[in-house]
Swiss-Prot record:
Heterodimer of an alpha and a beta subunit. Belongs to the class I-like SAM-binding methyltransferase superfamily. C5-methyltransferase family. GO terms for biological process: DNA restriction-modification system; methylation; negative regulation of gene expression via chromosomal CpG island methylation. The active site is at C82. This is Type II methyltransferase M.AquIA.
């Protein structure tokens, strides 16, 4: 039986794609950006997309769109906006309204009561204000929840994973916070790739890491491409302007 998930802060659906490959289907997606919502509707035509600010969207509305009741959904996933914790930004953390959106994610988790949840964010979240943000999130996520005469509690753990360690040609570290109410201990995956000097070594379990993939490994077989318009030549400055407008 296909497992169902609720997707929060869905963006263009990248995180959903990963979970679809793992056998899940998205029962409902919640996203504020209109362009991202159009992309979600194009790529997931059978999935309800709720377009709007999550702070004004009740969990009941989300559950109704997903056609489930509390306790019936398998998974809640999401990557709340990370600018307030990013090492590239001003790092206002929980003092920034965007930083507080991690609590909106947990609000939906606590009211929808999925079997499990996965939240992704930038590595900077761990160290913000000497770990106070992470401590607050872990504490909130671990609080007992009473529903229909019963009490539920999530076992929560976190770990920093680097995309390069799993065959992606990019060094991209992210913290993953995982919780489940099934009484199970979650095991984070072990790296499959590493630096060339480590890739030649065999660990204690007889496992040999593959060498990191490079951009050349990923795209060298693609045919040469020419930008279809002058727009590509202006992207760099456009990105700089967008970064400036987002508080960096």
């Amino acid at each position: 039986m296909e497992k169902k998930l609720i997707s929060l802060f869905s963006g263009a659906g990248g995180m959903d794609i990963g979970f679809h490959a793992a056998g899940f289907s998205t029962a409902v997606a919640v996203e504020q950006d209109p362009s991202c919502c159009n992309t979600l509707r194009l790529n997931m035509p059978d999935t309800p997309v709720i377009e709007g600010d999550i702070t004004s969207i009740t969990t009941q509305v989300i559950l109704e769109a997903a056609k489930v009741n509390p306790l019936e959904i398998d998974l809640v996933i999401g990557g709340p906006p990370c600018q307030s914790f990013s090492l590239a930004g001003k790092r206002m953390g929980m003092d920034d309204p965007r930083g507080m959106l991690v609590l909106e994610f947990l609000r939906v988790v606590r009211e929808a009561l999925p079997k499990c949840f996965v939240m992704e964010n930038v590595k900077g979240m761990i160290n913000w204000s000497k770990g106070k943000a992470l401590e607050a999130i872990m504490t909130e996520a671990s609080q007992p929840i009473k529903y229909a005469g019963k009490e539920y509690k999530y076992a929560v753990s976190y770990h920093v994973l680097n995309a390069a360690d799993f065959g992606v040609p990019q060094f991209r570290e992210r913290v993953f916070i995982v919780g489940n109410r099934l009484g199970k201990t979650f095991q984070f995956p072990e790296p499959t790739h590493g630096p060339s000097n480590q890739a030649r070594q065999i660990d204690l379990f007889g496992k040999q890491l593959k060498p990191y993939k490079t951009v050349q490994d990923a795209i060298s077989t693609l045919p040469p491409a020419t930008p279809p318009s002058a727009m590509a030549l202006r992207v760099s400055q456009t990105i700089k302007d967008r970064i400036k407008n987002h508080g960096y």
